Amino acid sequence: MYYIGVDLGTSSVKLILMEPTGDIVNTVSKTYPISFPKPGWSEQNPTDWYDKTCEGIKELIKDIDKDKVAGISFGGQMHGLVILDENDNVIRPAILWNDGRTTKECDYLNNEIGKDKLTEYTANIAFAGFTAPKLLWVKNNEPDNFKKIAKIMLPKDYIAYRLTGVHCTDVSDASGMLLLDVKKRDWSEEMINICKISRKQLPASYESYEKVGCITKEAAMELGLPDNVCVAAGAGDNAAAAVGTGTVGDGMCNISLGTSGTIFISSSNFSVDNNNALHSFDHADGYYHLMGCMLSAASCNGWWMDNILKDTDYKEAQSHITKDMLGNNHIYFLPYLMGERSPHNDPLARATFTGMTMDSTRTDMTQAVLEGVAFAIRDSFEIARSLGINITETKMCGGGAKSELWCTIMANVLGIKVHLLKSEEGPSMGAAMLAMVAAGEYENVKQAADSIVGICRTIEPEKDIADRYNSRYNTFKDIYPALKGVFEKM
């Protein structure tokens, strides 16, 4: 049998065709436009998502026996607002996760409703990217559109609706709406009232691995598939990626070292960071997770190499950093090129080099960039540990994970094992695995992950290096507070 995983990204949809063994049969990617109608705004047409997903599915399955396709599921960009009228037509373009128009609405929620109340109701506070502030923006600025709303949906769930006719979402994606009581895994009545909506306007919520239905006869005819293809609810992109990397079960962790950085920590217990440095969301495996977000991760090294050194040979630049140099560098780098989310929630934070002398070299500064990102990731780890979560190992993926040196630095800064993966298909692979569970191929998400996800290499910390980094991390922690007031004046 075959399973389709759909990763609905911001610029493209990526699809994967997998067998239950984890073997990848085919992959396809289709792009679609994004519009910026005003500075800070970011929108897309939901019908573009569906059209390109259908194109991709047809191409994905063209060379196989279509009757052997057993399931499909989704991972997708989170937080986007899709609103439908009573005839299920899209009312206006979707407002995306990276849209920044909701400053006033976030101020209202965080200051007038109050961060403590929001945390009580949803386990999170308001950020510009979240869905509830967007909903309030429509209410305040497009009242006619607000009155037309019959259903409030998220991006990937619009695709599921078009394929099944079911208005649904999953708890991992819904966690990022600021409308879900994360602990109870159900809609928050308080937030429903605050946003002046009704429960019937919200989709039915499922666990990520649950079957929401089968594709309709119309969708089956359009795609050339049988109409008994099982559709699973799917997950938000980070939770789907966590499934795809095997980050399921208590205390499991995944670090995604891409342009931005994500620290994803799975836990069987619900916990909230009262300082709001980490998000508390539901996980796709039925557990919970804490998530830290760095706005600049591998992009720090890209900036350093491309903009400053004007050098594209990343491997050569890092080859001069020897093992005995690890933990002995005198330069510190704050990796806040675009401000920072976790743990500071400070858009005014800036990147800095600190500690240069006449003896400092290009290699020292290259090393400092790699170490600065690792120290910033440790900030999120320390918060999770303070909440009683014991992290002993992590998966690592993304472009930065291709650097063996960076992975070695990470293992020693964090003091834990770092596992590198055989496959990095991420959200699409996780989505396909969720479809397998929904179709009965596996009993649960952990069983699927244990059977499919492979580790190609493990890097372990070395005590002497880890001890040196512990000392340096304590100094790193002092730099941002010392400069915060300076950043505010810039």
Question: Would you name each region that the model predicts?
Answer:
Residues M1-R92, E120, K148, A220-M221, ...:
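N-terminal glycine/serine-rich phosphate-binding loop of ATP-dependent small-molecule kinases
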Residues I4-G5, T103, N110-I125, P133-V166, ...:
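Active-site core segments that coordinate phosphate-bearing ligands/cofactors
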Residues L8, P20, P46, E86, ...:
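Generic detector of well-ordered alpha-helical packing
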Residues G22, N45, I72, D99, ...:
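Residue-level signal for inorganic ion chemistry
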Residues K58-W97, I125-T131, A160-D181, A204-E207, ...:
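Short beta-strand-loop/turn "lid" adjacent to the catalytic site in phosphate-handling enzymes
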Residues D65-K68, K196, Q201, N390:
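Short loop/turn motifs at secondary-structure junctions
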Residues R92-C106, L421-K422:
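Short, acidic/small-residue loops that bind anionic groups at enzyme active sites
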